[in-house]
From Swiss-Prot:
One of its GO terms (molecular function) is sterol 24-C-methyltransferase activity. It comes from Arabidopsis thaliana. Highly expressed in vascular tissue, mature leaves and in regions undergoing cellular expansion. One of its GO terms (biological process) is methylation. CDD domains: AdoMet_MTases. InterPro entries: Erg6_SMT_methyltransf (IPR050447), Methyltransf_11 (IPR013216), MeTrfase_SMT (IPR030384), SAM-dependent_MTases_sf (IPR029063), Sterol_MeTrfase_C (IPR013705). This is Cycloartenol-C-24-methyltransferase. GO terms for cellular component: endoplasmic reticulum; plant-type vacuole; plasmodesma; plastid.
């Protein structure tokens, strides 16, 4: 993809720097606080994805998530397998109506629709990502089985009992309130059917009184557009409070033969995911610097690159210390 022309998403190029400054002000390193982020989550998350999506797609591809990974397996292969695993856990059948909550540009929904021969609706509140996702649907020839709806997942525009299955891949972490989000998912899911998710969470090893732990948490929050990273136990409580029966749950990061954060580790090198390596990120950072200098990229692009790099450092440190996971998995059922 053309990184330079897409930087800033739907934000006018002349307004990108102002958007970056406003986004940064939501976060603790720039004087922000959790209450403000939660109160303004729609604005914060939209600014984040307008600013960051082009970087994500350039470095990560169409599926913006981590994955359990086997030795000898490429990052791309592991990402597909991670998506297939979720679809199999849900038991999605051909022709069923499925909802992807917080679908990004639709990489997982296209993969799951093809894998299960189902009809998948992607829910997203970011206009740029939906525009990009529709273009990718057209290029992939899946317009009839994959579609997008622009809406807030805290206030879904669907009738009760609309979907045969619902899933979220590293997306509902953007919700200001887990219970409110899960309750909406419960409402639109048909009775007897299941909801599965990979959640970003702090683990039981996280110590809120440890300054280094809080620094890592803050780095992940600013670099990934998050109001607050919840504990795994809080997600589980919210699920049950929303009415779900939890079939099983587990932090899948614990069983990954290859660390999930390896693609971002500065000590790791891979030709198959070169753009994510330290060398690849260094090249991208300097390319953006040059593009901004010669005005092919909007002012503020370097600062986006900087807070994404800050996120990478926080994710690796959080993964190494086992205080953070991007794959707290659960499968939950709405009672009949």
């Amino acid at each position: 993809m053309d990184l330079a022309s897409n930087l800033g998403g739907k934000i006018d190029k002349s307004d990108v720097l102002t958007a970056v400054e406003k986004y940064e002000q939501y976060h603790v390193f720039h004087g922000g606080n959790e209450e403000e982020r939660k109160a303004n989550y729609t604005d914060m998350v939209n600014k984040y994805y307008d600013l960051a999506t082009s970087f994500y797609e350039y470095g990560w591809g169409e599926s913006f998530h981590f994955a359990q990974r086997w030795k000898g397996e490429s990052l791309r292969e592991s990402i597909k397998r991670h998506e297939h695993f979720l679809a199999l856990q849900l038991g999605i059948q051909p022709g069923q109506k499925v909802l992807d909550v917080g679908c990004g540009i639709g990489g997982p929904l296209r993969e799951i629709a093809r894998f299960s021969n189902s009809v998948v609706t992607g829910l997203n509140n970011n206009e740029y990502q939906i525009t990009r996702g529709k273009e990718l649907n057209r290029l992939a020839g899946v317009d009839k089985t994959c579609n997008f709806v622009k809406a807030d997942f805290m206030k879904m525009p669907f009738p009760e009992n609309s979907f045969d299955a619902v899933y979220a891949i590293e997306a509902t972490c953007h919700a200001p309130d887990a219970y409110g989000c899960y309750k909406e998912i419960y409402r639109v899911l048909k009775p007897g059917q299941c909801f599965a998710a990979y959640e970003w969470c702090m683990t039981d090893a996280f110590d809120p009184d440890n300054a280094e732990h809080q620094k890592i948490k803050g780095e992940i929050e600013i670099g990934d557009g998050l109001p607050d990273i919840r504990l795994t136990t809080k997600c589980l409580e919210a699920l049950k409070q929303a009415g779900f029966e939890v079939i099983w749950e587990k932090d899948l990061a614990k069983d990954s033969p290859v660390p999930w954060y390896l693609p971002l580790d500065k000590n790791h090198f891979s030709l198959s995911s070169f753009r994510l390596t330290a060398v690849g990120r260094f090249i991208t950072k300097n390319m953006v610097k040059i593009l901004e200098y010669i005005r092919l990229a909007p002012q503020g692009s370097q600062r986006v690159s900087n807070f994404l790099e800050q996120a990478a450092e926080g994710l690796v440190d959080g993964g190494r210390r086992e205080i953070f996971t991007p794959m707290y998995f659960f499968l939950a059922r709405k009672p009949e």
